[in-house]
A protein has these predicted regions:
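Short, acidic/turn-prone active-site loops that include or flank metal/cofactor-
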Residues: 1, 20, 41-46, 66-68
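Conserved Rossmann-fold cofactor-binding substructure of NAD(P)-dependent oxidoreductases
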Residues: 1-11
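Structural motif
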Residues: 12-13, 36
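Beta-loop-alpha module in the N-terminal Rossmann-like domain of NAD(P)-dependent dehydrogenases
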Residues: 13-30, 43-47
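Rossmann-fold NAD(P)-binding glycine/threonine-rich loop
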Residues: 40-64
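Adenosine-phosphate binding glycine-rich loop
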Residues: 57-96
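C-terminal catalytic/substrate-binding lobe primarily of soluble NAD(P)-dependent oxidoreductases
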Residues: 82-301
Length: 301
């Protein structure tokens, strides 16, 4: 952290892309260093608690600016600016093209954390908490039958969008993966004292190799004022660059928002998750255009 304090002030903008376990501390250090930030660390802490610090130091931090959370929040923020939104659902997953397996496009420890942290969602205006991996449902996506289950993905939406009576985020995996993870969790492999060992074992099994093809799929459904809006994102490993779809969809969303800060299109200090940024239609349209220019399939169905 001392090294960050020493070098961060030399830059106009810093992208914080560290493991979630240290993300909050690093973001706090960057704000104390008075530098603008785009954060894609997805730390478990409530990042909105740093808003006063960001304002005090006159810096802007766009947080959770990946694909989900991130792009889905931007889409919701856009519609919430002119619709009386009644429900929001996000189904999202990054998977290998080889069926019925799993490869982690980011830290296995962060994936495991998704499977152990209680999942919070909003139902009829109340926060409901269930076990992660609960409420499985089959979902057809791009001709594939996948399985969705609860994960704690709403994050900042629980605070910023309290007026929306129904909100849910679910993770997508191949059928069968959920049952394997429940077995490991219930057998104690995901307990804190065993996590380092489990992560090492799963890292070898889940490691995305250079020539592994994978894809990212997201479906966002928003209902309100007797309207229904469904957006779908689909991207695959880039055959030429070998960049994974998760890298592309997360990284390019982050880059689009970096452009907003560096071109002085925002100019307000504070902590801003995607739903607060997406309320401005010009930002929403900029992000959608930025992704489409990079051949990421993103359409309103």
């Amino acid at each position: 952290l001392e090294t960050i304090k020493n070098i961060a002030p030399n830059f106009d903008l810093v992208v914080c892309a560290v493991p979630g376990s240290v993300g909050f501390k690093v973001l706090k250090t960057l704000l104390e260093s008075k530098v603008d930030v785009i954060d894609i660390s997805f730390s478990p802490e409530n990042i909105l608690e740093l808003n006063d610090l960001a304002i005090k130091n006159g810096v802007t931090a766009f947080v959770d600016m990946g694909v989900a959370p991130g792009l889905d929040n931007i889409i919701l923020g856009y519609y919430d600016s002119f619709l009386n939104v009644e429900s929001f659902e996000c189904l999202v997953g990054g998977l290998p093209k080889e069926k019925y397996t799993y490869k982690a496009p980011f830290s296995p420890a962060d994936v495991i954390e998704e499977y152990t942290r209680p999942a919070r969602f909003i139902e009829k205006g109340k926060i409901i908490t269930k076990e992660a991996l609960s409420d499985p449902q089959h979902v057809v996506a791009k001709g594939l039958v996948l399985q969705s289950f609860n994960t704690d993905g709403l994050r900042s939406l629980l605070e910023t969008m309290k007026h929306i009576p129904n909100m849910k985020e679910k993770t997508l995996r191949y059928v069968g993966h959920r049952e394997e993870m429940i077995f490991l969790r219930d057998s104690g492999f995901f307990n804190k004292e065993n996590l380092e060992f489990t992560s090492k074992v799963l890292f070898d099994k889940w490691k995305l190799l250079p020539f592994d093809d994978e894809f990212t799929f997201m479906r966002v459904t928003i209902k309100g004022d007797n309207e229904k809006h469904v957006w779908e994102l689909y991207d695959e490993t880039d055959k030429k660059t070998r960049l994974s779809s998760m890298s592309r969809t997360t990284g390019y969303t982050c880059c689009a928002m970096a452009e907003v800060i560096l071109s002085n299109q925002w100019g307000r200090p504070g902590i801003f998750p995607g739903e607060l940024v997406g309320r401005e239609s010009r930002i929403f349209k900029h992000v959608i255009s930025f992704l489409k220019e990079r051949n990421i399939e993103l359409v309103e169905c």
